[in-house]
Amino acid sequence: MNKKKLIENRLNVRSYYYFYALLKKNHILKKLVSFLIIALIFNACSNKMQVTSIQPSSIQLNNTSAEDEAIKALIEPYKSVLDNEMNEVLINSNAEAVKGQPESTLGNLIADITLWESNNILQKKNLPLADICMLNNGGLRTSLPEGKINVGKIFELMPFENEVVVLTLSGEKAQGLFKYIAKSNGMPLSGATLEIKDENAENIFIGGKAFDPSKTYRVVTSDYLAGGGDKMRFFNEPIAYQVLNVKLRDAIINYMRAENKKGNSLNPKTDGRIKSN
């Protein structure tokens, strides 16, 4: 079997970017990956076999280990393709976006982008728009720099394969969402404002209107959080659950590309949407 064809069949370039970023920084890990690739090739090209015994052994890898030039040459074409894709500049940012609480430049930016992109998709499908977006601070894995932002940086920010979903919540469930935000001293939020007092959410406004517990609200989030991740149990048993068939990371990339084509740049900022006393 042709080795290059085998690698093409086995590797999804985009899905493995985050691992590749680690690989670039870790010489020992690079050696281990080389060993695993060789094992994969021999396994794929061989007839069916059964394991009859296992004999463990130690393979010492450190920064004095020589690179395997054959494996390096095999990987190089795919590394080049990956580098070209990840180095694409998506947009310029007028300021650094960083995490923080109760609100932050990064949390506000990503929540706003996610709500905007989600409503674009819903509008094209003639579906009701979402009212708010709520994400989690733990899902934002790095800051975004001032200046050029490339695809690779968004993969660092969002290395997960989380999908964007829209949940329709009862007023009671939505109240639980805001209570969670208050107890957490803030989460990435868009479309709503509130004040945190003694770990309670007060003066809640959604779309400029006072929160009404008798109404239902449509919330954009990730499938991970919608499934109860980070103990967000208020998302359990929603009135409705819609999958938008777009990854959270891709929604961010799509927005940045589109805004850049319009000649726009990012302006990360805080605006008082979550106040803590």
Give the residues covered by each predicted segment.
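Sec-dependent signal peptide recognition
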Residues: 30-35
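Hard-cation-handling environments
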Residues: 54-143
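Helix N-terminus capping/helix-initiation residues
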Residues: 29, 67-68, 150, 247
